[in-house]
Amino acid sequence: MAGNFFYSKVYKGSFDIKSLENARPRRYNSKIWWSIHKRRFNIVENKNRNTAAIGVFDSGVGGLTVTREIMRQLPNENVVYFGDTARVPYGSKSKNNIIRFSRQIIRFLKTKNVKAIVIACNTASALALETVKEEFDIPIIGVIVPGAR
């Protein structure tokens, strides 16, 4: 699996990625798990170390809006965010590839001991949600049904 990914624990306050321009990507099992983007995000977390985090993933950084809303509604929860910027956009990929990508990311998030996962990607929610819900022993939520309410 080649390419860059954006993986971050989400912390309270402003996170200026420009300040990381000269940083080197961290490697996890010889894969790069985050990349530098010249953007500014306002992301929120109340660091509660007594509970497992909620994992959130998207095909890029758009899921940070979902993460922000989770933190607004559940201020005592921790969040681990994974943005798959290496393979964005998902809309042009096959269903089998979307399911494969989702499985890989869920396995990674499980290594971070998350207690639930939110698939913040519409494409992955539509194509992979039912499959991964059956395969993994962790609550997995998509964004299509909650967004339609």
Where are these regions (language model features)?
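Generic extreme N-terminus detector
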Residues: F5-F6, H37, N48
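Aromatic (phenylalanine/tyrosine) cluster motif
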Residues: F5-Y7, Y11, F15, Y28, ...
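Tryptophan (W) side chains
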Residues: W33-W34
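Non-catalytic structural scaffold of enzyme domains
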Residues: F41-R149
